[in-house]
Swiss-Prot record:
Keywords: Disulfide bond, Ion channel impairing toxin, Neurotoxin, Secreted, Signal, Toxin, Voltage-gated sodium channel impairing toxin. Its main location: secreted. Belongs to the long (4 C-C) scorpion toxin superfamily. Sodium channel inhibitor family. Alpha subfamily. Residues 21-80 form the LCN-type CS-alpha/beta domain. It is found in: Secreted. GO terms for molecular function: sodium channel inhibitor activity; toxin activity. Residues 1-19 form the signal peptide. GO terms for cellular component: extracellular region. Disulfide bonds join C31-C79, C35-C55, C41-C62, C45-C64. This is Neurotoxin LmNaTx30.
Length: 83
């Protein structure tokens, strides 16, 4: 019985860690979301099912916490903004 409880708790911890990630969300053109205000990014991240977000001042891009695994937080192709 104790082993079953340990396995259940370990599985819950692993699934919780694997289901959420932090990073810069990307749009359909593989571009980061530009920003000036934290509230815009927080709203964007929550819309994407994240926990919260803010505007990272050094690159003026939204950064999100707690995004689902299916959400893109890195891309291998260039941003195609304006094409």
């Amino acid at each position: 019985m104790n082993n079953l409880i340990i396995i259940a708790v370990a599985s819950w911890l692993v699934l919780g860690a694997l289901c959420k990630k932090d990073g810069y969300p990307y749009d359909g053109n593989n571009c980061k979301y530009d920003c000036w205000k934290n509230q815009y990014c927080d709203d964007l991240c929550k819309k994407k099912k994240g926990a919260s977000g803010y505007c990272y001042a050094l690159n003026l891009s939204c950064y999100c916490y707690g995004l689902p695994d299916k959400e893109k937080t890195s891309v291998k192709t260039k941003c195609y903004k304006g094409r």
